[in-house]
Amino acid sequence: MMRSHYCGQLNESLEGQEVTLCGWVHRRRDHGGVIFLDIRDREGLAQVVFDPDRAETFAKADRVRSEYVVRITGKVRPRPAGAVNPNMASGAIEVLGYELDVLNQAETPPFPLDEYSDVGEETRLRYRFIDLRRPEMAAKLKLRSSITSSIRRYLDENGFLDVETPILTRATPEGARDYLVPSRTHAGSFFALPQSPQLFKQLLMVAGFDRYYQIAKCFRDEDLRADRQPEFTQIDIETSFLDEADIMGITENMIRKLFKEVLDVEFGELPHMTFEEAMRRYGSDKPDLRIPLELVDVADQLKAVEFKVFSGPANDPKGRVAALRVPGAASMPRSQIDDYTRFVGIYGAKGLAYIKVNERAKGVEGLQSPIVKFIPKENLDVILDRVGAVDGDIVFFGADKAKIVSEALGALRIRLGHDLKLLTCEWAPLWVVDFPMFEENDDGSLSALHHPFTAPKCTPEELAANPAVALSRAYDMVLNGTELGGGSIRIHRKEMQQAVFRILGIDEAEQQEKFGFLLDALKYGAPPHGGLAFGLDRLVMLMTGASSIREVIAFPKTQSAACVMTQAPGAVDAKALRELHIRLREQPKAE
């Protein structure tokens, strides 16, 4: 081998030993006739010293520059007193170099590797192979590897089988757009890249592989946000003959073991919260429990007020009026309130009412707000008591359709928690359970809240009679306001699956066309089964403290779903298109 040690492995126990290092020149310094090279590899940095006594080697060291690839042999020795660097794993020692081979030269990188505050993300992605040399970027990918190793080890030890499922499959309605792949041998037909291995893992349960897992690539052609990529990685798990409590117990223990092994963080038993409670108290089905702010319903106190902004939603069965108390924030300037008003507008809110509680003992005179004149004093007192308002607080109000109020105040709660530094702890995991089976679309039709293969907590007859109130056997693990993973008990009887399809407007012909293979499988002794999938990229993002999943993926796409490094997607030649039976239409020019 070309090296004896990684740079980050060097320490005082190797004092006096000869070592050979391979890596990149991170930094070069010339101090009074002595040359120092900081050599970098994936494990860290090591300081190598060259003195003029070895003239040939010293001359080579004098010629090297940043990012040259080098091989160095030398002897480990303690650093002089006062020269120890506590910020480096190898900071107590240095290597006295006596052999230096330049394995390759390097041009000056397009950006410095020691700081990148002024480097645009597109430049970093264009030269990702250089960006990944940064110690902090390498650390994220190393942690990702540790995470997948821990998960594989746990699942292997618990009897799970790692089984691969197809990448080329057929399009099924799973919520997002599919990436389509034209078939050369079947003219006019297309494969789809899988949005998840959902149906294949269910078929593996029918086949008798009762504990399956896969670290799977998934693909969704959707609009991108900070936590989305067109291709992403899923920790996919499915089991037979286990109920919700069993599956949640196995996967919860996996996550607790993972955090202990990788970050030395211990979680207690995860609390459970229903979907209804999460939406009511936090305005989100993935609540961030680190933030000690809650939404409080006050519609009952505002039904009779003349202020239609409040009384309208308060009397609407589909409306909601909720309050959000922020302790000690009554001094918030109007400009900040206006900023928050614009913020909730993103979620459909038409405004943001507020009351500043300056001195409650003075009654209405001690309140600062444009809305108190519309609310009778007795109702106002009930509202302020209910939210726990005291002097120095500000109370925000949302009034609209329930969905808009929950989403707007829920998002405001998160924003306030971070802006005002209200977080009470570093980690707050929980399970959210008892999700609705369906959600109502704007046209009144129903769509599956999770996916159409989730089992309901009722019979097919009860489901058909009142689908809008049916609850599902679904469960999500949430951490710090982010959905880590979601799963459910699946439908394993054909009649129930067809009942769900009918509610979703999928008739018999479409059922057979798109899901005939699944319905066939359910006829041949499908066992009770269920599972869960974790988003690996999100998990790594949280565990590394990264701001985006692009920071924890080796070669991510941009927010426009492109790779600026390889220039993908790109054009293909006419011959390849003909073989695929595809003809491109010229796009009309914009006037």
From Swiss-Prot:
Compartment(s) where it occurs, according to its Swiss-Prot or TrEMBL record: Cytoplasm
Self-association and partners: Homodimer.
Signal sequence bounds: none
Family: Belongs to the class-II aminoacyl-tRNA synthetase family. Type 1 subfamily.
Gene Ontology molecular function: any one: ATP binding
Protein name: Aspartate--tRNA(Asp/Asn) ligase
Purpose of the protein: Aspartyl-tRNA synthetase with relaxed tRNA specificity since it is able to aspartylate not only its cognate tRNA(Asp) but also tRNA(Asn). Reaction proceeds in two steps: L-aspartate is first activated by ATP to form Asp-AMP and then transferred to the acceptor end of tRNA(Asp/Asn).
EC number: 6.1.1.23
Lineage of producing organism: Bacteria, Pseudomonadati, Pseudomonadota, Gammaproteobacteria, Pseudomonadales
GO biological process, one term: aspartyl-tRNA aminoacylation
PROSITE patterns referenced in this protein's UniProt entry, alphabetically: AA_TRNA_LIGASE_II
Region (Aspartate) residue spans: 198-201
Alphabetical list of PANTHER family matching this protein: ASPARTATE--TRNA LIGASE, MITOCHONDRIAL (PTHR22594:SF5), ASPARTYL/LYSYL-TRNA SYNTHETASE (PTHR22594)
Main location: cytoplasm
Keywords: Aminoacyl-tRNA synthetase, ATP-binding, Cytoplasm, Ligase, Nucleotide-binding, Protein biosynthesis
InterPro entries: Aa-tRNA-synt_II, aa-tRNA-synth_II, aa-tRNA-synth_II/BPL/LPL, Asp-tRNA-ligase_1, Asp-tRNA-ligase_1_N, Asp/Asn-tRNA-synth_IIb, AspRS_core, GAD-like_sf
NCBIfam families, alphabetized: aspS_bact, PRK00476.1
